[in-house]
Amino acid sequence: MAQKLLEKYNYPYLSIDHLKMGMIRSGNTQLTPVSADTELTMFLWPIVREIIKTVIENRQNLIIEGCYIPFDWKKDFTDEYRKDIRGYCLAMSENYIRMHFDDIKQFANVIENRLDDEDCTLDNVLKDNARTLSLAKENDLDYILIDGEYKIDMALF
């Protein structure tokens, strides 16, 4: 999705997963690629949060994508910052996951060459998406529910 937005709006994007791997490979953390998402979020979010503030203060545009953004991220920004932030959670419906699980698994490996995806089971994907959707609603976040065709045409303005 971030790549599509880059192509449409010519805005640069930052993959939080790339930041994660840079921090791990550079030795700036003892965390590993398989550390718990909660630990990785606690480590990465303060960095990402301050990048967002810097981008806004400099009146620049940046698309940030990744799963290491806490669902309660709004509490970390004043109204002045929040008015310039567009945040969306992506989730897939149970029906979509069941009908397209093989495609989901294959596409995940195309985007990020995963050495080990044994945790990418139908049950785990269903649970993760249900959790994502629930937390997005609980935190009053905008979300995109993929239910039919995976075609998202998002307007940033």
Kindly give the residue locations of the regions a language model identified:
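Conserved substrate/cofactor phosphate-moiety recognition/catalytic segment
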Residues: 3-47
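Conserved beta-strand scaffold positions in the cores of enzyme catalytic domains, especially
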Residues: 11-13, 84-89, 143-145
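Residue-level detector of anion-binding/catalytic polar loops
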Residues: 12, 61, 138-142
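Conserved nucleotide-binding/hydrolysis micro-motifs of P-loop NTPases
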Residues: 18-21, 69-70, 92-98, 151
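Short, hinge-like loop/turn segments at secondary-structure boundaries
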Residues: 29-33, 80-83, 105-107
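Glycine-rich phosphate-binding loop used to anchor ATP phosphates in small-molecule kinases
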Residues: 39-92
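A glycine- and Lys/Arg-enriched "phosphate-lid" helix/loop adjacent to the NTP-binding pocket
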Residues: 85-131
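NTP-dependent small-molecule kinase module
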Residues: 130-157
